[in-house]
């Protein structure tokens, strides 16, 4: 049954496939900084796709329909987390392909530094956003999701100088911590979703 739930979310994504192709092309032409290009692409594709699955569930009332079927709520949560991981890997592959097209980019060094840091930050963000999305209805969750994406970025840009090189020194710790946080987040989402009423 989890496979069918995953398939459902990916069928929804086909409608937006053209945008996922156009975004990297647009940023490839607009940005010269390869680190920023990769980070922006991976964040937009991953977060955008996940938000769209929740939006489609809310719009089509598919959550209500799915919950009326003999499916455990934890299976619904697991399916959404698996979809998030698959989309993250797809966005990383697209990002690496785009980076490979850039002249003068050391792809192996790029993977060890920027890519690992980017994946870690996306996993941390998903660890916060997914439980909120399972806990609240889509309309409430989307505002919190956007705030959580925009506010920290704006605050760090305005008041702090973000140094990717310093962040990259702690890549291994950050990556392991983000994976642990993502796993804990899945259990939290499960508990919140089981208590939610439809």
Model-assigned labels for residue ranges:
Residues 75-77:
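Alpha-helix N-cap/helix-start motif at helix boundaries, enriched for small hydrophobics
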Residues 68-73:
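Short helix-to-coil transition segments within interhelical loops
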Residues 2-61, 79-198:
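Hydrophobic alpha-helical transmembrane segments of membrane proteins
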């Amino acid at each position: 049954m989890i496979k069918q739930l995953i398939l459902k979310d990916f069928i929804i994504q086909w409608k937006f496939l053209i945008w996922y192709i156009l975004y990297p092309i647009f940023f490839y032409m607009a940005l010269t900084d390869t680190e920023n290009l990769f980070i922006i692409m991976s964040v937009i594709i991953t977060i955008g796709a996940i938000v769209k699955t929740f939006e489609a569930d809310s719009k089509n009332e598919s959550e209500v329909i799915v919950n009326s079927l003999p499916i455990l709520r934890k299976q619904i949560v697991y399916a959404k987390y698996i979809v998030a991981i698959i989309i993250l890997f797809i966005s990383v592959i697209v990002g690496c392909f785009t980076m490979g097209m850039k002249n003068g980019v050391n792809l192996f060094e790029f993977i060890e530094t920027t890519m690992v840091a980017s994946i870690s930050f996306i996993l941390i963000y998903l660890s916060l956003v997914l439980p909120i999305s399972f806990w609240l209805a889509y309309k409430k969750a989307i505002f919190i999701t956007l705030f959580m994406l925009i506010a920290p970025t704006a605050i760090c840009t305005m008041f702090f100088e973000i140094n990717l090189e310093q962040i990259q020194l702690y890549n291994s710790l950050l990556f392991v911590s983000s994976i642990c946080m993502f796993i804990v987040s899945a259990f939290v989402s499960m508990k919140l979703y089981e208590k939610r009423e439809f």
